[in-house]
């Protein structure tokens, strides 16, 4: 077979426009199409959804692993199911928080997300004790509360660091939670999934990346999949 390395497809306006003409042009270079990029499956672009109309299309091994591992969270997870949502952007996390308010046993939010939370506080929503927009880490009381919940969980999803982990003085919360999840995962008491660029970077910095059950390669794609149960790129392969 032949290999052809293409330039960044987004330099062509037809990629993001999901142009049928551009999708056909891409399809003309191959006999089959394999999508192995979970991290871009939330985009309805020519190389992700458009091309599947013109070639026999399949999910690659990495994409299949992402789907099967994330479905362990969304479809009949072993309970209690606990979800930890961190980071600073509430808007991008809101759909997945609201989804898990309906389906998870516990949903824990970082101090910054807690400070900005103005929606319904359901019984399973656990806000940080230090709800402050200036807060750069969860405090000791919150760490203990979160760890007690994790201790009695059987499945944990974590998306978003719990503090400004880049600075050593603000990594304590993220470190404590990462170590607790890693410890329980390694002793087979917990199935753990972690995802998102900052979360993965923080856990890698702590040297714990290989201590979790599954590390997702998706950030926005993972959040959308968890909220909706599918993605445009995955749906396109199923048609």
In which residue ranges do the predicted regions lie?
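Active-site loop-to-helix "anion-binding N-cap" substructures in soluble metabolic enzymes
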Residues: 1-239
């Amino acid at each position: 077979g032949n290999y052809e390395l293409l330039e960044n497809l987004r330099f062509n306006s037809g990629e993001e426009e999901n142009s049928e003409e551009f999708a056909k042009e891409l399809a003309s270079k191959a006999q089959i199409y394999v999508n192995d990029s979970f991290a871009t499956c939330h985009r309805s672009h020519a190389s992700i959804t458009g091309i599947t109309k013109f070639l026999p299309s399949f999910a690659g091994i990495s994409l299949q692993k992402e789907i099967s591992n994330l479905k362990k969270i969304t479809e009949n997870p072993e309970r209690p199911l606990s979800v930890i949502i961190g980071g600073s952007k509430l808007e991008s996390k809101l759909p997945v928080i609201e989804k898990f308010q309906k389906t998870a046993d516990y949903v824990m939010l970082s101090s910054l997300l807690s400070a900005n939370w103005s929606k319904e506080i359901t019984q399973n929503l656990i806000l940080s004790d230090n709800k402050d927009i200036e807060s750069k880490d969860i405090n000791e009381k919150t760490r203990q509360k979160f760890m007690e919940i994790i201790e009695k969980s059987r499945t944990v999803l974590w998306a978003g660091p719990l503090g400004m982990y880049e600075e050593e003085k603000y990594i304590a919360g993220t470190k404590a939670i990462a170590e607790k999840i890693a410890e329980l995962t390694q002793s087979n008491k917990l199935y753990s999934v972690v995802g998102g660029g900052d979360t993965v970077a923080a856990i890698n910095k702590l040297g714990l990346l290989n201590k979790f059950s599954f590390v997702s390669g998706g950030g926005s794609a993972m959040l959308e999949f968890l909220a909706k149960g599918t993605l445009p790129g995955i749906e396109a392969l199923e048609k």
